[in-house]
């Protein structure tokens, strides 16, 4: 304990400028923090806006897919499977389209 007490006054003035240097770094950090916050806010806003655009695009793409009549898809599948026409007919009977147009047509 005595040795530590003897060292502390000798380290005291040495720690002083060290603490001041740390404070300067903290000051610089505080000076940069609002700029970083602004930059982060901009990037975050941009990312959020871009994310919203992606979401809307996905929704529009889904709506566009829904608007397409599945008959086109089925015709394409039938053309693709010309050899297996019977299997395609069975799949047509089993799988009915959920779109309103096909429901109205079937009912």
From Swiss-Prot:
Primary subcellular site in the record, as a coarse category: nucleus
Tissues in which the protein is found: Expressed in spermatids (at protein level).
Record PTM: Proteolytic processing into mature chains is required for histone eviction during spermatogenesis. Transition proteins (TNP1 and TNP2) are required for processing.
Superkingdom of origin organism: Eukaryota
InterPro entries: PRM2 (IPR000492)
GO cellular component: male germ cell nucleus; nucleoplasm; nucleosome; nucleus
Region annotation Disordered: where it falls in the sequence: 1-94
Keywords, comma-separated and alphabetical: Chromosome, Developmental protein, Differentiation, DNA condensation, DNA-binding, Nucleosome core, Nucleus, Phosphoprotein, Spermatogenesis
Compositionally biased tracts (Basic residues): 43-94
Subcellular location: Nucleus; Chromosome
Knockout or disruption consequences: Male mice are sterile due to reduced compaction of chromatin in sperm.
Phosphoserine found at: 8, 10, 33
GO molecular function, one term: DNA binding
One biological process term in Gene Ontology: chromosome condensation
Quaternary context: Interacts with TDRP.
Role played: Protamines substitute for histones in the chromatin of sperm during the haploid phase of spermatogenesis. They compact sperm DNA into a highly condensed, stable and inactive complex.
Family named by the database record: Belongs to the protamine P2 family.
Protein name listed in UniProt: Protamine-2
Gene (name only): Prm2
